């Protein structure tokens, strides 16, 4: 039997998703808790491996098991052994054709950026921060050069293991909201550090360091050295993983973050 789980976690509490020898990752915490509840080892496969500091709101995993448990039993039982920084949101039996990673056809990330002369300790680990105003119109113009199917080699990390750098970026939405600017990135898939590298470039344009057309030059170069430094992870959230309707994957619970209404309004906007 294949079981899918919807997971939320505070990325600031972990050294990324993927299991490590030190055991301080989201995958390690989840698999330890599943083992406690199921009294057997269960290996999880994830939709997207997030980095240290990156949060999960709509993360999806699957595992195979011979155990027959009620759906909510998996939720309640696993959560009983998880730390407060991780929670299973839902559980659902799936056909063998479902795969958390390979069945997904799109991913959506949001970035919450605090723009203020002084950093806020209340936002530590929850939002990125810049101390100077940003030109939103310039960032929107720059983002328009990136939408579409492109070779995103200039925005991938040296550790990226993806077979192809070609991805289809469907949307970059940018919306100011008081002292915040919110970004929405939606694509069929992302390269390692791709969103944070895109953020670094957009912020550089917003600060006036480069014209909006610079992003087209960076994209065309396919050279990571031509782009801006990788931006901080703290404000980045994996919010949604899209699957074919036949799997009826439950939607992510975005209401758990204070900016959910702003993010909802970003849908379809640029």
Curated annotation (Swiss-Prot):
Transmembrane segments: none
EC number(s) reported in the record: 5.4.99.12
Active site: 51
Stored InterPro entries: PsdUridine_synth_cat_dom_sf, PsdUridine_synth_TruA, PsdUridine_synth_TruA_a/b_dom, PsdUridine_synth_TruA_C, TruA/RsuA/RluB/E/F_N
The UniProt record lists the keyword Amino-acid biosynthesis: no
Annotated substrate binding sites: 109
Reaction catalyzed: uridine(38/39/40) in tRNA = pseudouridine(38/39/40) in tRNA
BP-aspect Gene Ontology terms: tRNA pseudouridine synthesis
Mitochondrion keyword on record: no
Enzyme class: isomerase
Top-level taxon: Bacteria
Keywords per UniProt: Isomerase, tRNA processing
One GO MF term: RNA binding
Protein family: Belongs to the tRNA pseudouridine synthase TruA family.
The protein's role, per its UniProt record: Formation of pseudouridine at positions 38, 39 and 40 in the anticodon stem and loop of transfer RNAs.
Subunit structure, as described in the record: Homodimer.
Protein name: tRNA pseudouridine synthase A
UniProt organism field: Burkholderia mallei (strain ATCC 23344)
């Amino acid at each position: 039997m294949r079981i899918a789980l919807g997971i939320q976690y505070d990325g600031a509490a972990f050294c990324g998703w993927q299991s490590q020898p030190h055991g301080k990752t989201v995958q390690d915490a989840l698999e330890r808790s599943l083992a406690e509840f199921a009294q057997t080892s269960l290996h999880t496969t994830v939709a997207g491996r997030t980095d240290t500091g990156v949060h999960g709101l709509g993360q999806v995993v699957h595992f195979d098991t011979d155990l027959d448990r009620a759906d909510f039993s998996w939720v309640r039982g696993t959560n009983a052994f998880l730390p407060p920084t991780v929670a299973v949101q839902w559980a659902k039996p799936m056909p063998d054709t479902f795969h958390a990673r390979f069945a997904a056809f799109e991913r959506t990330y949001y970035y919450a950026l605090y723009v203020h002369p002084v950093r806020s300790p209340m936002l530590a680990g929850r939002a990125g921060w810049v101390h100077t105003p940003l030109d939103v119109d310039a960032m929107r113009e720059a983002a328009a050069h990136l939408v579409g199917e492109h070779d995103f080699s200039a925005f991938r990390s040296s550790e990226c293991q993806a077979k192809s750098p070609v991805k289809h970026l469907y949307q970059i939405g940018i919306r100011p909201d008081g002292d915040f600017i919110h970004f929405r990135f939606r694509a069929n898939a992302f390269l390692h550090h791709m969103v944070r590298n895109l953020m670094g470039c957009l912020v550089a344009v917003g600060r006036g360091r480069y014209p909006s057309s610079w992003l087209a030059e960076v994209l065309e170069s396919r050279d990571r050295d031509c782009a801006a430094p990788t931006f901080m992870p703290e404000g980045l959230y994996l919010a949604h993983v899209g699957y074919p309707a036949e799997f009826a994957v439950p939607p992510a619970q975005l209401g758990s973050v204070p900016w959910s209404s702003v993010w909802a309004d970003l849908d379809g906007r640029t």
